[in-house]
Each structure stands twice: as structure tokens, then as C-alpha cells.
Regions:
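Juxtamembrane non-transmembrane "cap" segments at the membrane-aqueous interface
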Residues: 279-286, 355-376, 430-437, 668-679, ...
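Membrane-interface helix starts
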Residues: 8-23, 334-336, 454-469, 725
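Transmembrane helix boundary and interhelical loop/hinge segments in multi-pass membrane proteins
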Residues: 221-236, 240, 244, 612-627, ...
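Membrane-helix interface segments
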Residues: 16, 243-244, 333-338, 634-635, ...
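Secretory targeting signals
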Residues: 24-85, 153-228, 249-329, 383-384, ...
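Central hydrophobic cores of alpha-helical transmembrane segments
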Residues: 22-24, 335-348, 467-474, 725-738
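Alpha-helical transmembrane segments of multi-pass membrane transporters/translocases
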Residues: 17-20, 31, 316-324, 349, ...
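Short, membrane-interfacial amphipathic segments enriched in basic
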Residues: 1-4, 190, 432-450, 579-581
């Protein structure tokens, strides 16, 4: 117990841990609020109290009576919309139609008509009610249809099993049909109710919280395992017979306890924020009352389901915590810990998000730690897995697999902690390298600060491996071609047109367009002739017409896009712009691609988070920071030498990640269209002289400035934390996680601002990046050199 309390104090006494915890809570709350405070949710947020009152009112009525009253009110809003349309139109035919419809409403639905008249006299002040009435009517329709959904389950299974695909009684498909019907039959008499489920659903579906919790668990592991290793304290944990055993047990118990507390805390905060936004949810209703959980076969209330959701989060984070503990015990290198831990978790996330439900790899999707963390899907949906042609419910299988993983990680963590030397020692490859260097490499005795720092970064901290990997990645990625998938049938024909037309508008190209126009006019004329030809049979007419329609629906649509582009280019040419034909599909994605922009920048930030912390933290780790005072400006020169090393690393990483795509693009499509004005592709561009290559250069400059700011922020964190692993974790919270959140926002990227002429946003981003870089650089310089300054002042005094 004393060891447990000591380990707890060791974590809680660290100000950085508390700062990161509250920072994560604040960022998570802000991102949750931002994700809910959208234009689509505006009515729900504004009138949440009124919506709750309406639900209370209708839930007290029988469903049939409530449906009848709601239908009448919805009809009143429909009649009101006809009044509005009649008042706004001046078309005589529409006026006649609206007048006739209103007379029919007045005759057949006098109550609804009178209510619509009253609404019109008030000016439609309560139009928001229409939205909520429709929502409640959908809930009532769902409640009324649910018994039929359950009753027909067995009939559907019987009907499907009669087909040849499902007829084999020993197959998974056959067993799955009847197991599903039997499992749902237990819900036959489930009572459903109207409920305001907005806060409940928003809490269940918000998954970004898991990333924050994983980051905090990673930080806890740093304090429990890496901190003592870097301080060289593990050699002292042998003073009693069971010193290491008791120590690792205390560490693991504390890790699991803190992980569960943090996980519950985040879910509680999420539910509190959503309740504040949308109003409370009646947690006493059956979970099937919420239409999103129609497929849930658990006989639980909404409150009990919320507890199961929290339990799933805790179990999932237990498994991740045990795996992180094992990684921290096995590896002594901070970079290997970071890459192995987050790399494995990231791979699991990719499997869960990218593998389809019906894929032959779906076991990797569902026997997955993120399937557990997604508690709403884990407990809220019905899924049977194919285990040796048997239909087995996914929940016990997943629990069994990850329960085993948890036990194995925990047991091996205890064994390895007790048996292995936890002090950081040189590995076999490091020893072989030292022998090789002693025979074939002689030190030149250089006193250059830059050479010394570059040597420490590349050789001592093994970042030469990362640089080599980046160079290899750049070389390999430069080969190949760039291909854009066709989203429509006409895209291939449009590309064929652009391959011929691309470039300046010439008389030859204009004649070609005229020929194509005549060709499609003749096709239209031919369609009419076929329809009027009495000598052809109906089958022949249909076959010939279908053939022409296929041409018009693919090549014809593509040519319509060409004509639209041609007319727009002629208008631009009249304004004195050097208008050119260009493939809009290809170059729109080339200039502004949400996925490529954020993937490249997120990967660049990840590379920086792995490498940059080693530049400054090494001096604190080996205690050399106190010896760097041989001259008056020794620390200042050393500081800028380290900054130069960071900038070189940044430049290598940026070049390796960004340049290969442009090399492949030019190899595929050439460089002829790079000087085409951007306004030829995007109509919103205000600067008419801005070309494609200008947009690309601006994009790269902005991202390089952002990356520079990120580099200096990581440097500042490493100087304050004095630990490479702490820096990686905190930088992940400050940089990587916000990037994942920003990915969901379409207009929060440089490419979008460039093509929409948001010049102010671009300039402000550049200025803010430069300001952050300068401020963090000055703070880092002051912190790194403050010991020397105070010693000099004391000496002079």
C-alpha cells in the first residue's frame, strides 16, 4: 500500500501531468462543443427547452392520439407554406394552383386551415416547431413499427433460408439467420417511449475522447516507467527480496486505476456538456426507445446502457494500458516506445475504420480494441462472427481475446520487470557499431558546435536511421504515377477531351468543339427519327435509343462540361486573362485536396515529434547542461547550433514528405498546365493572375511556416520537460490530436483558402506561424541560457 501511495504521489506531484490532464479536458470540451454547435444543430440548441416540453406533452398521450395531433399540426405548417408561396409568386398558373389547393384544404381540413391562418397573421414566428414536430412524428412512427420489426424477424429468416445461398444448414449464413431471429425474439414485449435522446447520442458517438485518454495513459506510463529509468533509480529497487515484484504490481495497479478514473472523467464531462446543450435524457426508458439502437438486443435501460458504455471504455483502456506498460518495459529507447506503442494503436484504428463490414478481413475490424472503445457500436449493434462456420455473438469473443491480451501483457510486464535490467544499456548493434568505429574511424578533433550537435543528433540518438528512412521514402515515393479515381461515368470521356484540348484556345480546337457539337445535335435528331419511324419494331426502337442514350449519358455529359468551360474561358479572355483549357478534375485535386494536405502535414508533425525532442533533452539527460559555461556565450552558441540541426531535420522531413507527390504528378501529367490561371478552374478566385504553380507554392510556404512553428514549440516543450519521452507525449496532445480534430472541418486548411481567395486567412496563418516561432524561440533561448545568466550575475555581485 505504501508503494502504491508513493507511486500515486509521484504522478500527481508532477505539475506537467495535471496541466496536460486539464488541457486535454479543455480541448476535448471545446472540440465537442464545436462539433455540436453547427448550423444543422442550430434549432436543437436554440430551442432545446421547448423541444423537451413538447416531448413531455406528447409522451403523456397515447401514441395514436399524439400522432393524429402532430399530423394535424404538420398539415397546418404545410398550408402556411402555401400561403407564403402564394404571396411571393407572380406566375398566374402557380397562383391558380395555390388558390385551388388552399380551397381544398379549407374544405377538407378546416381546423388545420384555421391554425395556418393564425400562423400567417403572426408572421410565422414559431416555424421552428415544424422541425421538432416532424422529429417527434418520426419517433412515433418508429415506436409503432418496432413490434412488426421484431415479429417479422423469424419470417424473414425463413424466407431467406429457402434461397440457395442460405439453404445449407451447416453454413454460417444459415445459422446466423436463425440465431438472429431467436435473439431478437426476446425483445418482443419491449415497451418503447418518446425520449429526448440528443445528449445521449452525442455522448455515445463522440469518439475523439479516446485519443485524449490514450495520450494521458501514455503520459502516466512515462512517469511510472521511463522517469526512473532515465534517473538511474532502478538499480536501487533491489533492497528487499520482493522489491521489484511489489514495485511493478504497485505501478500496474496505479496505472489501471488512473486510466479508469481518467476514462470515466472524460465520459462524464462529455455527457455534462451535451446535457447542457440539448437538455436531459430520461435514462429510465428502454434503450430500444432510441431509434439508433433498434438493433441492440440487450434488455437494458438507457442509464444501464450508459454504464455499459463506460465499462467498455474502461476495459479498452485497460488493455491499451497493459500493452503500453509492456512496451515501456521491453524497450529502453524513447523513440522505439513511441513508435511501437502508438504505431500498434494506430494500426488497430486503421483496421477498424478502413475495413468494411462484409470484407473477408472483418475479423480484424471487429476483434479490435477500437471496437470495444466504440461502446455504442460494441453493445448497441447486433453482430455475429463467423468462427469455424458457427455464428457466435461478437461481444464474448472480443472480451475473451482482449482479456487474454490483457492478462498476457500484465504477466509479461511483471516477469520482464523483475528479470530484466531496466537500466538503459547499449544494444548489440550499438556495441558492434562502436567496435567498427574504433577500427576504421578516427576522430578529427573538430571543435565545431554544429558538427558536434549534428553528430549527437544523428549518431548518438540514432536519428540517422530516421533520416535514412525519410530519404528512402522520398526516393521510392517519387516513382510511379498519380491517378484520380472516376466518380462519374462521364469522367473518363471528359479526361479524353481534355487530353486533346488542354492548353491555349486555338482555331483548330474551336473547330473540333463545333464538330462535336454537331455530332451530338445529330444524335438528338436521330433519337427523334427513331421514335417516329413506324417501320421499326418497339424492341428495335428501344435498343437503338438505349445505345444513343448511353453515349449521351457519358460522352454527352462530358461534352456539356467542355462547353461550359469553353464559354467561361471566352468570358475570361474578353477580360484580358490568358485563359486555357485544363482538366478541372485533376487540377482541382492537385491544388486543393483535403485528404492529401492533412495526411502530409499530420505525418510531418509525427516525424517532428519523434525527432526534435532529442536535440535539447540530451544535455539535461546526461547532466552536461551544467558544464556548458566555458565562455560567456557558450550556451547561446550551443542553442543556435541545435536550432540549425532542427531546421535541417525539418527541411529533410518536409522535402521527403511533400516533394515526391509533385515529382510523380509532373511525370504523369507534365508541367504544361502549371502556369494556367487558377480562375480557369475555380470561379471564386479573385486574383486573376494567380496560376496553378503560384497556388502550390503558397500552399507549401504556409505549411512550411506552420511546420517551423511546430518544430520550435516542440523544442520549447523539450527544454521545459527536459525529457524526450515527456516531450513526445505532450507534443502529441498539443499538435497531433488537434490536427485529427481539424480534419473534420472542411474549410480549415490552406488549399481551401487559396481556391476561395481567403487572403486574410492565409496571411494571418503565416503571420501567426512566424509569431509563434519567434516567441517560442525566444522563450526557449531564455530558458536554455538562464543558468549561465544567473551565475554570471552572482559572480559579478
Amino acid at each position: 500500500m505504501k508503494l502504491f501511495i508513493y507511486e500515486l504521489k509521484k504522478v500527481l506531484n508532477k505539475k506537467i501531468f495535471l496541466v496536460v490532464l486539464f488541457l486535454c479536458l479543455a480541448i476535448n470540451g471545446f472540440l465537442l462543443y464545436s462539433s455540436q454547435n453547427t448550423e444543422e444543430n442550430n434549432l436543437r440548441l436554440t430551442y432545446s427547452d421547448e423541444y423537451a416540453k413538447m416531448l413531455d406533452n406528447y409522451s403523456s398521450m397515447p401514441c395514436d392520439e399524439a400522432k393524429k395531433q402532430i399530423d394535424n399540426e404538420l398539415l397546418a405548417y404545410e398550408i402556411f407554406s402555401r400561403f407564403e408561396s402564394l404571396a411571393q409568386t407572380d406566375n398566374e398558373e402557380l397562383i391558380e394552383n395555390y388558390t385551388y389547393e388552399l380551397e381544398e384544404y379549407k374544405k377538407n381540413n378546416p381546423t388545420a386551415y384555421q391554425k395556418a391562418v393564425e400562423m400567417s397573421e403572426k408572421g410565422g414566428e414559431e416555424l421552428w416547431k415544424n422541425y421538432f414536430l416532424y422529429d417527434i412524428s418520426q419517433q412515433i412512427a418508429y415506436i409503432n413499427s418496432y413490434p412488426d420489426f421484431i415479429d417479422q424477424m423469424y419470417d424473414r429468416a425463413k424466407a431467406q433460408s429457402s434461397s440457395s445461398i442460405f439453404s445449407d444448414e451447416n453454413s454460417f449464413s444459415y445459422k446466423n439467420l436463425y440465431k438472429t431471429a431467436n435473439d431478437y425474439s426476446e425483445l418482443k414485449n419491449t415497451e418503447l417511449s418518446l425520449v429526448n435522446s440528443d445528449a445521449f447520442i452525442a455522448t455515445i458517438k463522440y469518439s475523439l475522447t479516446d485519443i485524449f485518454v490514450i495520450a494521458i495513459v501514455l503520459l502516466i506510463c512515462v512517469y511510472l516507467f521511463q522517469y526512473e529509468r532515465e534517473k538511474g533509480l532502478y538499480s536501487l529497487v533491489r533492497c528487499t527480496k520482493f522489491g521489484r515484484a511489489k514495485t511493478i504490481i504497485s505501478k500496474l495497479v496505479l496505472l489501471f486505476a488512473l486510466a479508469s478514473v481518467v476514462s470515466v472523467l472524460f465520459v462524464f464531462c462529455n455527457f455534462t456538456i451535451n446535457t447542457f446543450l440539448y437538455g436531459g435524457t430520461d435514462l429510465s426508458v428502454n434503450i430500444q426507445s432510441i431509434s439508433e439502437f433498434r438493433n441492440c438486443t440487450l434488455k437494458v435501460t438507457a442509464g444501464q446502457f450508459l454504464l455499459l458504455f463506460v465499462l467498455a471504455k474502461v476495459i479498452g483502456i485497460f488493455v491499451i494500458s497493459s500493452f503500453f506498460a509492456l512496451v515501456f518495459i521491453v524497450f529502453s529507447s524513447s523513440a522505439m516506445m513511441y513508435l511501437t506503442g502508438l504505431g500498434t494503436v494506430g494500426t488497430e484504428y486503421l483496421f477498424y475504420t478502413l475495413i468494411g463490414q462484409n470484407s473477408f478481413l472483418n475479423l480484424l475490424k471487429y476483434i479490435n480494441i477500437f471496437y470495444i472503445l466504440d461502446g455504442g457500436e460494441f453493445f448497441g449493434s447486433y453482430l455475429n462472427l463467423n468462427i469455424f462456420s458457427n455464428a457466435v455473438t461478437s461481444v464474448p469473443i472480443v472480451f475473451a481475446v482482449f482479456g487474454t491480451v490483457f492478462l498476457l501483457c500484465t504477466v509479461f510486464s511483471c516477469i520482464l520487470f523483475c528479470k530484466r535490467n531496466q537500466q538503459k544499456t547499449a544494444g548489440i548493434f550499438s556495441r558492434l557499431l562502436e567496435k567498427f568505429k574504433s577500427k576504421f574511424y578516427t576522430l578529427n578533433g573538430s571543435t565545431s558546435i554544429f558538427k558536434g550537435e549534428f553528430y549527437k543528433f544523428t549518431v548518438q540518438n540514432k536519428m540517422a536511421v530516421m533520416i535514412v528512412l525519410l530519404v528512402l521514402f522520398a526516393i521510392i515515393s517519387s516513382f510511379g504515377t498519380v491517378r484520380y479515381p472516376y466518380s462519374e461515368n462521364s469522367d473518363a470521356d471528359y479526361k479524353a477531351y481534355m487530353e486533346y484540348l488542354e492548353g491555349d484556345i486555338t482555331s483548330e480546337k474551336e473547330n473540333y468543339i463545333l464538330e462535336q457539337q454537331n455530332y451530338f445535335n445529330n444524335l438528338q435528331q436521330r433519337m427523334g427519327e427513331i421514335a417516329e419511324n413506324s417501320e421499326l419494331s418497339e424492341n428495335a426502337k428501344q435498343a437503338m435509343s438505349k445505345s444513343i442514350e448511353n453515349i449521351l449519358n457519358s460522352k454527352g455529359i462530358a461534352f456539356e462540361r467542355v462547353i461550359e468551360q469553353y464559354n467561361r474561358l471566352l468570358e475570361l479572355d474578353k477580360k484580358g486573362i490568358d485563359a486555357k483549357f485544363i482538366d478541372e478534375n485533376i487540377y482541382k485535386s492537385f491544388v486543393s485536396s483535403k485528404t492529401r494536405e492533412w495526411n502530409n502535414f499530420a505525418l510531418l508533425c509525427l516525424v517532428l515529434v519523434i525527432g526534435v525532442p532529442y536535440v535539447f533533452s540530451v544535455e539535461y539527460k546526461n547532466g552536461m547542461i551544467n558544464l556548458i559555461r566555458t565562455t560567456e556565450n557558450s550556451k547561446t552558441k550551443l542553442f543556435f547550433g541545435k536550432i540549425v540541426v532542427e531546421c535541417i531535420y525539418l527541411l529533410i522531413a518536409f522535402t521527403a514528405l511533400y516533394v515526391p507527390y509533385f515529382v510523380r504528378f509532373i511525370n504523369t501529367y507534365g508541367a504544361n498546365s502549371l502556369n494556367t490561371p487558377l480562375v480557369c478552374i475555380f470561379e471564386n478566385v479573385q486574383e486573376t493572375s494567380f496560376s496553378v504553380i503560384n497556388a502550390v507554392v503558397v500552399n507549401l510556404i504556409c505549411y512550411f511556416l506552420l511546420a517551423t512553428a511546430v518544430t520550435f514549440v516542440i523544442s520549447a516543450v523539450s527544454i521545459f520537460t527536459r525529457s524526450s519521452m515527456f516531450t513526445m507525449v505532450i507534443s502529441t496532445v498539443l499538435v497531433i490530436i488537434p490536427l485529427l480534430a481539424l480534419y473534420l472541418i472542411e474549410n480549415a486548411r490552406i488549399g481551401y483558402w487559396v481556391v476561395n481567395s481567403h487572403i486574410i486567412a492565409i496571411v494571418m496563418t503565416c503571420l501567426l506561424s512566424i509569431l509563434i516561432a519567434i516567441v517560442t524561440l525566444e522563450i526557449s533561448k531564455f530558458k536554455f541560457t538562464e543558468t549561465r545568466i544567473w551565475r554570471r550575475i552572482n559572480a559579478k555581485a
